[in-house]
């Protein structure tokens, strides 16, 4: 599908020259599609409003900031550089419901996702998505256990 729309595939050099916010822009959309697909696969008979609320738990800036902090140790050198470029790029938009630090971390995360997507690194993208989903599921289980012990 990408090849049809892009014509030519992007090279690493092309992406190094691209504004990191452009990579984050596409990364935001790619990440959301992955997460929505995951949420739907686990909640087939749920109304759209509830699906949206579950999706927000993954896509809000503080969640993305948490995920990138946790998975950073699994990123290779190139991905770390891409992340830092995205995180450190000055943006004209501001965080609505997040700290500046979380917003920048989330932008770095989305930059990595966009970079991998435009390079057609689908296997690597899936590995990162699995790490994120596993982190979410672990934190949800821990939250449930903590709530259970309070009563």
UniProtKB/Swiss-Prot annotation:
EC top class, as a word: hydrolase
Cofactor: Mg(2+)
Subcellular location: Cytoplasm
Pfam families, alphabetized: Ribonuclease_3 (PF00636)
GO CC field: cytoplasm
Enzyme Commission number(s) of this protein: 3.1.26.-
GO molecular function: ribonuclease III activity; rRNA binding
Major location (coarse): cytoplasm
Keywords for the protein's UniProt record, in alphabetical order: Cytoplasm, Endonuclease, Hydrolase, Magnesium, Nuclease, Ribosome biogenesis, RNA-binding, rRNA processing, rRNA-binding
Source domain of life: Bacteria
GO-annotated biological processes: rRNA processing
CDD domains: RIBOc (cd00593)
Active site, renumbered: 28
Subunit-level organization: Homodimer.
The protein's role, per its UniProt record: Involved in correct processing of both the 5' and 3' ends of 23S rRNA precursor. Processes 30S rRNA precursor transcript even in absence of ribonuclease 3 (Rnc); Rnc processes 30S rRNA into smaller rRNA precursors.
Protein family (similarity comment): Belongs to the MrnC RNase family.
Name of this protein: Mini-ribonuclease 3
